[in-house]
Amino acid sequence: MTPEHLPTEQYEAQLAEKVARLQSMMAPFSGLVPEVFRSPVSHYRMRAEFRLWHDGDDLYHIMFDQQTKSRIRVDTFPAASQLINTLMKAMIAGVRDNHALRHKLFQIDYLTTLSNQAVVSLLYHKKLDEEWREAATALRDALRAQGLNVHLIGRATKTKIELDQDYIDERLPVAGKEMIYRQVENSFTQPNAAMNIQMLEWALEVTKDSKGDLLELYCGNGNFSLALARNFDRVLATEIAKPSVAAAQYNIAANHIDNVQIIRMAAEEFTQAMNGVREFNRLQGIDLKRYQCETIFVDPPRSGLDSETEKMVQAYPRILYISCNPETLCKNLETLSQTHTVSRLALFDQFPYTHHMECGVLLTAR
């Protein structure tokens, strides 16, 4: 696999290998055959980052080979959305011969949606001035004249210039309902939108007929919380990153959802609050005791759940766990399987043609 070539003819084989590997890893905890959710074989990534290489008068995107660290020119990137590929050509054409935009430019980041919106961030090793703003505004207007719904951002040390906004709004069809998600530049979003839809629909399916309330740790922009709200009386969710919390609050309003409460705090802090170890000003006005959370949802970072959070989640009858690292999931399951059994197992092929696996498990109390 190279950045400009995807071995689509090998997709079935690589997916089968992942299924077998996940099943083997999960064998100590479950004999279930994973439910498998396939990715589109190309144009599945909704975001991409490229370094820029200045080669005389020429200018082009590059990536680095992970093994050899050698430079690879990238003019097309079939793993990324069609919109990113269109923008890659348009950005090079618009920047190459413009000194204000090209000088000291070292990276371009692309974020796109299925609703055909884009934020493009240009990163510089220089101070950005009014000349840059005028040139960037002209480029943005030229891109929009080509029918591209794009927002440009300039970044340099301690500097961020938004020509108009730093977000785009995604619209996803999820189990018969359109969900609106504000996605903020430089904040986490699910990279594979088609796979995200399947993950949300799987989570909805395994939690149907739920009783009581849902607690979610690490909720991001509310991706899962808001989709799952229809299955629960109430949802209480935590997130630490300010931009993600702001996006989640917007998404609650945009989707006309009235049973989700977002709290800005770390999972570890929330564990302390739930256990009565500490009191937090951020929880004033929120009576944790009135929530009857029968289900807890966790989508932790690659490091998995810390030991205190492991203990905390064991108190819930059902644990829905989405993992971007099955190795740390299995490490957590060494503890969680003492009190819970794996009742559902799914593999989500979030990153085709790579070793990476995303998976989901539903755990029910013994």
Swiss-Prot record:
GO terms for biological process: tRNA methylation. Its EC number is 2.1.1.-, 2.1.1.35. SUPFAM superfamilies: S-adenosyl-L-methionine-dependent methyltransferases (SSF53335). Keywords: Methyltransferase, S-adenosyl-L-methionine, Transferase, tRNA processing. The active site is at residues 324, 358. CDD domains: AdoMet_MTases. It holds the Pfam family tRNA_U5-meth_tr. S-adenosyl-L-methionine binds at residues 190, 218, 223, 239, 299. One of its GO terms (cellular component) is cytosol. It is an enzyme of class 2 (transferase). GO terms for molecular function: rRNA binding; tRNA (uracil(54)-C5)-methyltransferase activity, S-adenosyl methionine-dependent; tRNA binding. It catalyses: uridine(54) in tRNA + S-adenosyl-L-methionine = 5-methyluridine(54) in tRNA + S-adenosyl-L-homocysteine + H(+); uridine(341) in tmRNA + S-adenosyl-L-methionine = 5-methyluridine(341) in tmRNA + S-adenosyl-L-homocysteine + H(+). Dual-specificity methyltransferase that catalyzes the formation of 5-methyluridine at position 54 (m5U54) in all tRNAs, and that of position 341 (m5U341) in tmRNA (transfer-mRNA). Belongs to the class I-like SAM-binding methyltransferase superfamily. RNA M5U methyltransferase family. TrmA subfamily. This is tRNA/tmRNA (uracil-C(5))-methyltransferase.
